[in-house]
Each structure stands twice: as structure tokens, then as C-alpha cells.
Amino acid sequence: MKPTVWHHLRLCPHGHPDETIDDAAIAVDETGTIAWLGALSALPHGYAHWQREDLHGAWVTPGLVDCHTHLVYGGTRADEFAQRLAGVSYEEIARQGGGIVSTVRATRAADETTLFVQAAARLQPLLAEGVTAIEIKSGYGLDLASERKMLRVARQLGERFPVTVYTTFLGAHALPPEYAGRADEYIDEVCDRMLPTLADEGLVDAVDVFCERIGFSLAQTERVFEAATRRGLPVKLHAEQLSNAGGTALAARYRALSADHLEFLDEAGIEAMKAAGTVAVLLPGAYYFIRETQLPPIDLLRKHGVPIALATDHNPGTSPLESLLLTLNMGCTLFRMTVPEVLQGVTRHAAAALGRADRHGALEVGRQADFAAWSVGSLAELAYWIGRPLCEQVVRGGTPVFRRMNG
């Protein structure tokens, strides 16, 4: 690529709308790295001969980060949506053999090509909203071959699309039918066979567990964390979504990158997260879709200074959401977060939730030039508009990878 100066833009380099530069420029070298940024009037003379790209006054933010998704799976769960509308709870559906296990059946039956095509269709709306990094979990295979298949598809998405994909092994997502009544034996399989094999194959960037009364116990969760730690893999946790099971405190003991959901999180768990540097990942799409009523403890998270990230939690059962911008709106309207909080929640804090704050979530000299240009009058509009296409252009590694067609 040619060294390029992107100019005539309004710059929000760290995802905070109070830290901006009007009439700014970003100089990107031939490697796709940011060589300089600041006010256009201060552009050093050494960049005068570089190619120019005029963004016509657009707002520019770091590329967005969707730090919690289940993007690869087979089938849908539209039938369960109808059940919930009729009053059947998420937990009851799971106990009846639906929920995660129904998606497991569909995912096991699908081949890699089918899973790739379906996941690619889910990914593309996110890319058109400025997402340049995404986490994708396994967890709908629940056996070695199927978990491998999911993680391979996730890796392929990162190779075939202009997005950085981080994979999370979520083998301890639910108990597969063949292990009914034998949860400890299944955890043996996860820890002794599945995790080591998939890690050795280079398919795992982090490890997650669903710690809940309809998921896995604290003791079982700790076994998975121990297995991950032995292999040098960071951990994450689905925690405190349906009850206060104490998973967050356990996650903090293992210095988890993040604890996610957190509707029933208590102050002791928050204090543990703060001490461990664990990010709180809130998932308003799931809260909305299954009509939860217990709000995450936003005020306590603020009080203790725990960084808050937001994510789509895209999945077929509780958050079939393909819009990170709608997630921003939900963070404000449902969780009563501020615009600066939600914007940082999908940039710097989302990057921290992946352990990649040094690579994503900010625009700084020496970093890869991943950014999005927005046709808005103010950054608050990113959380304000519902359903309007706002992203004009996405640049990854200094190369334009998306431009909105007008007219």
C-alpha cells in the first residue's frame, strides 16, 4: 500500500467523545501502521508528498471491537422464541432439552462449509458497522470433532474477511446429551482431551465456562480454569446472569480477562474484579431478548472503577443480534450507561476484555491503522440512531475494506 494521509476528519482516538481533535489527520505508512496523528495544521512537512484521502469532515473512531459472540452455529431457535412469548422460561426450555443443546444437534449435523457460509452472513453486518476485531466462541459442538469444526470456521472467517478474529474455547457451555447425569466426567473430557488437543492445534486464544445453576458448578469451573492456566491460556467466564453463583470471585482469582453478563453480581464480586483487573462485559441484547428484569449493578461498577465493555453476544437462543450500534443504544436505554461509557465499551474496554488493549481500541502512533469513519454530526448519534446506516468507511491496516454506497 502507498503511504497515505487521511485528512479533513474529526478524530476521537481513544473512543471517548470528550477527547477529540477537530480538522485532524492520520498518516499511515506502507506497513499499515500509524506514523503520525493530530491536527492537520500541525502535519509535519515530511508527509507532504504522501497520498491524500479526504474524509470530508467525518468522525473517525478506532475500529469497533465485539468482544463476546457465539457467531458459529447451525440452525436457529425461532421456535423457542415463540415458547418464551407464551411464558416458558429460558431455564425451563433448557431443562426440556432445548436451549443450547438444540443448537448442539444442529451444529454437529452441519459441515464446515455450511457453518462458514452461515457465520459469514452474520459477520458481514458487523463489519459494515465498523467492527475490525471480534471474539468468536465455540460451545455448540460439545465433542472434540465438533468443537474443532467450530474453531476452524472461526479461524477461516479471520482469514477470509477483513477482521481480526480471537477464538475462545467454550467446551464447558452445556452438558451434552450423551453425558446426561455425568457432568464431572464431561469436565474430564474437556480438561484432559478437548482443551489440550485444540490448544495444540493452535485453535484456542482463550478459555470460557458457563458457570450457572443450569451450567457448571464452581468446582467444575475451577477445574477448567486450572487446565487452561497450565497451558498458559487466559480465561473468561459467563457469570451471574441468572443467579449469584459466585463465579465472578472465582474468575478474579484466576485473573480472568473478563466476566460476562453479571446481572446478579454483588459488591464483593465487583471488588474482586477490580483487584484482578477483570473487565465487566455487559450484554444488553440478551437482557432484552429474554426479558430479564435484574439490571447489572452499573453504579457499583462505576464506584469501584471496573472497566465496562459491551458486546452483541450474538447467539441463536438469547441474542440473535447483528448490530453493535444497537448494542450501544441498549446500553444507554436499558442499562442507563452514558454515551462515553458505551463508546469506550466497544473500543478500549472491549479490547481489554480480549487482553488486546495494546492492539485494538485506540488510535496511536505505532499501532495498526484500524478505524471507522462515521457520517454523524456528533458521536452521541452512534448510540442515538436506531437502524440507520452510519458507517461511511472502514479502514483496516491502512487499507479501505468497506465503503458505503450512496445513491
Curated annotation (Swiss-Prot):
Protein's UniProt keywords contain Zinc: yes
Statement: the UniProt record of this protein carries the keyword Iron: yes
Binding site for Zn(2+): 68, 70, 238, 313
EC class name: hydrolase
Keywords: Cytoplasm, Histidine metabolism, Hydrolase, Iron, Metal-binding, Zinc
Pfam families reported for this sequence: Amidohydro_1
GO biological process entries: L-histidine catabolic process to glutamate and formamide; L-histidine catabolic process to glutamate and formate
Cellular compartments per GO CC: cytoplasm
Assigned protein family: Belongs to the metallo-dependent hydrolases superfamily. HutI family.
Protein name per Swiss-Prot or TrEMBL: Imidazolonepropionase
Organism: Burkholderia cenocepacia (strain HI2424)
Name of the encoding gene: hutI
